[in-house]
């Protein structure tokens, strides 16, 4: 569980903030073979940047997070899911995923959002696995920052002289260092309000998609004062992928197939949000403004004589993207098989 600050969310595990220890190898959470690495995302056309998603694998290093009944550690599960989510996001043109931590080491909570900001993140996604005293507790959840947490964070930023030169407003890059205190307060409040609204929006889309592949603990986005969500300029969500304290869910969380399904559902929610709200100057904004984004999710039933490459060409979607969207490890498909066509596919066919 993540550390909370005055939250009514499930109790977190207090963590001492120490300098990061030396990096140690991650202990594998599954014996299944790792998916093949995909090539880096294709470069964007001039003036059409990629949307950047910062993925934060919860806990790490001396902070193991929650423990499963058979010894599974949250820090290993979250890193495995984060890496799979990064792989899937990077398979889609117009998006780039950056990991906040890439190995088994601890990063102080506030530094995680600092790292995301330095990477130019348009969205911050923190991955966790829940725990509860009752082993029967189950289901995935999504959190955004609470209103009370947002108010206290705005006050902290104004009081902290180190933030006076920081930038807010995402791609707008609005500096506070030349603003008087009242104007800085207004700008921060507007930025935090917009960020929170976007967080709730993308959070609900992620939650709805997760509900298709795993039980939900709550069917609405919950709000709490989690430290990693307190960025005034970056929409931020915290995803509880399931209860690692539940024997059944702990076993699923350790499998590659479930990690892939969770990552795919999170990616789908993120994609839906940015297709409706693409940051200006991005490739996705250009697709939308040019009318080249298909109106909604599509399915294709494989018929005799078709290959995956032909289907990808028909819908003008990358072969790697089509494989990722359908969790395919090869290009082998069967007649009658239903394929999901990513919503960013160009509508080449009626």
Where are the language model's segments positioned?
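Catalytic-core regions of hydrolytic enzymes
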Residues: 6, 15-177, 192-196, 200-202, ...
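Active-site-adjacent mobile loop/cap segments within catalytic or ligand-binding domains
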Residues: 123, 133, 184-284, 323
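Surface-exposed edge beta-strands and adjoining flexible/disordered loops or tails in beta-rich
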Residues: 1-19, 259-263, 339-341
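Intrinsically disordered, low-complexity mixed-charge segments
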Residues: 2-4, 276-296
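Stable alpha-helical elements in mature extracytoplasmic
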Residues: 74-77, 81, 85, 112, ...
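Primarily a LysM-type cell-wall glycan-binding module
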Residues: 290-319, 337-338
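Extracytoplasmic
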Residues: 48-52, 92-94, 120-124, 137-139, ...
């Amino acid at each position: 569980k993540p550390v909370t600050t005055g939250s009514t969310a499930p109790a977190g595990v207090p963590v001492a903030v120490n300098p990061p220890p030396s990096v140690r190898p991650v202990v594998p959470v599954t014996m299944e073979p790792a998916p093949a690495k995909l090539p880096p995302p294709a470069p964007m056309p001039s003036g059409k940047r990629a949307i950047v998603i910062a993925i934060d694998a919860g806990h790490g290093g001396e902070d193991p997070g929650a423990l499963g009944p058979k010894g599974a550690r949250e820090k290993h599960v979250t890193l495995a899911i984060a890496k799979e989510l990064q792989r899937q996001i990077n398979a889609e043109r117009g998006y780039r995923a950056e990991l906040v931590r890439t190995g088994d080491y601890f990063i102080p909570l506030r530094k995680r959002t600092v790292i995301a900001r330095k990477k130019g993140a348009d969205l911050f996604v923190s991955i966790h696995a829940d725990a509860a005293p009752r082993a029967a507790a189950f289901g995935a959840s999504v959190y955004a920052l609470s209103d009370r947490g947002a108010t206290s964070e705005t006050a902290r930023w104004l009081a902290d002289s180190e933030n006076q030169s920081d930038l807010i407003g995402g791609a707008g890059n609005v500096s506070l260092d030349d603003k008087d205190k009242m104007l800085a307060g207004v700008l921060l409040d507007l930025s935090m309000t917009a960020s929170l609204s976007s967080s709730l929006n993308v959070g609900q889309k992620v939650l709805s998609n997760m509900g298709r592949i795993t039980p939900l603990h709550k069917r609405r986005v919950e709000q709490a004062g989690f430290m990693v969500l307190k960025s005034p300029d970056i929409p931020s969500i915290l995803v509880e992928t399931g209860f690692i304290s539940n024997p059944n869910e702990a076993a699923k969380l350790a499998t590659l197939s479930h990690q892939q399904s969770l990552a795919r559902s999170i990616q789908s929610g993120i994609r839906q949000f940015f297709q409706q709200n693409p940051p200006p100057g991005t490739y996705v904004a250009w697709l939308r403004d040019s009318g080249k984004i298909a109106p909604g999710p599509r399915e294709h039933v494989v018929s005799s004589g078709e290959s995956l490459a032909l289907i990808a060409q028909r819908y003008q979607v990358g072969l790697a993207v089509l494989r990722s969207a359908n969790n395919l490890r090869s290009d082998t498909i069967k007649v009658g098989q239903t394929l999901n066509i990513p919503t960013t596919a160009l509508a080449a066919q009626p």
